[in-house]
Amino acid sequence: QTWLPFV
């Protein structure tokens, strides 16, 4: 997952 602001 690369769409999360903390990921």
Swiss-Prot record:
The modification Valine amide is found at residue 7. Keywords: Amidation, Amphibian defense peptide, Pyrrolidone carboxylic acid, Secreted. One of its GO terms (cellular component) is extracellular region. It is found in: Secreted. The keyword Calcium does not apply. Transmembrane segments: none annotated. GO terms for biological process: defense response; positive regulation of smooth muscle contraction. Its main location: secreted. The keyword Secreted applies. Expressed by the skin dorsal glands. The modification Pyrrolidone carboxylic acid is found at residue 1. Induces contraction of intestinal smooth muscle in isolated guinea pig ileum. Belongs to the frog skin active peptide (FSAP) family. Peroniin subfamily. This is Peroniin-1.4. The lineage of its organism: Eukaryota, Metazoa, Chordata, Craniata, Vertebrata.
